[in-house]
Every structure is written in C-alpha cells, then in structure tokens.
C-alpha cells in the first residue's frame, strides 16, 4: 500500500532547475584558488577551463565581458585566485562555476609582476647591449655582493682560490632574501662604487624559489646595477633561474661558481703562455744566429773567389761593417730580450709565481751568455781565417818574388821580355826592381848557347 502522503516527484528538468537555484541563492559568490588545466578559448572569446587541486576539480567558464578585464594570459598549470558564482548547467546536469574575476595566486602574481617590470625596463633600454660594460682582463680586484653566510660566497671563494689565489677579493655582505634585502643590495653596490676598490663586481646568491630570488627582481636593484660604473656579473640561483638582475647586468653567469670562473684567470694557463713565449724567443735567437752565420759564410766565400789584390781592402772594410752590424743586431736582440723579460716579469709578479719567474730569468741569462760566447768565438775564428788568407796572398804575390832579388824587364810597348830575340841593339828597356824602375839602352846582345842537344 502507498502511504497516505506521497513524496514529491521531480522531472529531470525540474530537478536540475531546483538544484541550480539552490546553488545560486544559497552559495552566492565565493573565492576559489586552484590550478588551471584544459584551458580553451573558442571563437566566441569565452574562456573554458578546469580548476583543480590534489584531490578534486571543477569546470569553469569565464565569459568574454569578464575575461577582457584580466591583465594576463592564463597558462596551463598556473595557480590562480578567482571570484565566481556556483551554478548548474541544466541541459546536462553539470555542476560548474562562472568566473567573474581572476588574478595570479602566489608565484603566479610574482610572475606577473616580473613580466611587467621586465617589459618596462626593456622599453627604457636598460637591457640594450650598447650599455654593457666589458669585463677587465685581467681583473685586479673582485668585489662580491652576497650573504656572508650563504653557500654562494663559499663557492665563489673556493673557485677564486683554486684558479687565481693571488687575486684580491673584497666582500660586501648583504641580505639576499626578505623585505630589507633589496635596499641592502642597492647600498652595497653604491658603496662598492664609492670606494672604487674593485674593477668587477659579482652580485648574486644561491638557488631557491621565485619568492626566495625576488630581491633580484626588484626595480631598485635593477637600476643600481645599471648605474654602476664598475662592471657587474650577475650570479643568481641556478642556470634555469633568470632574474631581472640578469638582464641588466653586464654579464650573466649561470651560477656563482661560474661567475668566479669568468672573472678570474687560470694560473696554469698563464704559466703555459710564459713557456710558449720563452720557446718563441729561443727560436728567434736560433734563427737569427743561423741567418748571421749563413750570411758570414757567403761573404767569406765571395772573398775567397775574388782577386785579393783588388778586393782585399774592400772586403776588409765590408767585414768590419758586418761585424759592427752583427754587434749592433746582437745588442738590439739582447735589449729586446731584456725588455720582453721585464714585461714577463711584471706580469708574473702580479700573479706572484716567483719560483717559475726566477727559473725563467736564469734560463734567459744563460741563453744571453751562450749567445754572446758563440758570437765571440765565431768572430775570433773569422779573424784567424782572415789573417791566414792575407799571409797566403802575400806569399804568392809577385812583389814577394821581387823582394827575393828577381826583376821584370819590359819593352817600350809594355811586353814582358822573356828571350833576347825580342830586343834589338839601341832599344830602350824598363826593368822593375823591388824598390823602383831602371831604364836602360841595349848596347850588345849575346845569346846563351844551349848546353844540351836534342835527342833524335
């Protein structure tokens, strides 16, 4: 049997309508936070998406007249805070919310501020390459602006000590997180510029969330970096963390350790450069000596090939000139070597590698001594060969023959007389002796009879 009072019977349409009215009147407007997913925007301009958290989700719609007041483009995975009305879509019985307003929540809001400041400073030209200052090469003093207790400072000092232990470092401690951090960072940058002790600054901190790194997205910090006369290397967080300070800085390093690598020089590389320079100097000296020796050999060969009585004086003069040129060239070479040594010594003194500098100086002095001794020995040998050549030439000279008591007689036509049949009585003859000439007239001609007969 049916009870005396029958329960109300709803049609599906009436049920959905009743539930919709209950939701709209009883709940009113609510604030909801969640993560956006399945975001779509059809041609109508309306937005359709899902808000979800770890355990639930709800369908959302935001009509065109509402979403055009939103100042950012919603992205998949973005956390937002919405003001909405709860309703039911009667044809399908789907429960949904109608969003009236939307704003980023948490990091979403920070991300929006980040993009707005980035666009503003970029429009002002603070990111332009023309304002980027070159880093000093090499750096003579490095300033570090970071927390004195953070891991970033430890990493920077560790790298600098390993790569360039003689490089001075000045630390400007400052907070890198919290409400007071931007002001302290700005004052540290201004202090470094006032003291003018450093020629490059590292500004940064270790990794963290967007909120942790937010001090380096502050407009005051960005403008202080841009106004710094000292080149600034930003080193904020990890390689994937990009802040406004990175865009304004003269150079962005992906990590604090990388920043220390950038501003320092590798001491081992410097020593290799010194070794390479020394080898080039030795090769230049060897080439110079070989070239001078070859030139001297050529001159000596030409001296031997020419007639000594005609070329002796000129070759001697040329030899003296060559000797002077060689001495002058040697002095210049030694002077340049000394100047190069002084430059290398100054560069090495800046890095304080004293033991290697001392060995390099000793090596150069030895080379200079060897070079001077080699040239002296060659010049001595040359003089000895030259004296021997003069002695030999004097020995075979016709003048030496005259000195031994011989003479040379010529006719009036200048021909040397070898037989009596070349002259006649009454002719005038000229005789060359060691100390002069004698003219004589032929009075008598008397041939010498041959003492031997020819054998047939």
Curated annotation (Swiss-Prot):
An annotated Gene Ontology molecular function: exodeoxyribonuclease VII activity
Record Pfam families: Exonuc_VII_L (PF02601), tRNA_anti_2 (PF13742)
Subcellular location, record wording: Cytoplasm
E.C. no: 3.1.11.6
HAMAP family, per the entry: Exonuc_7_L
Subunit structure: Heterooligomer composed of large and small subunits.
Known function: Bidirectionally degrades single-stranded DNA into large acid-insoluble oligonucleotides, which are then degraded further into small acid-soluble oligonucleotides.
UniProt protein name: Exodeoxyribonuclease 7 large subunit
Source species: Escherichia coli O157:H7
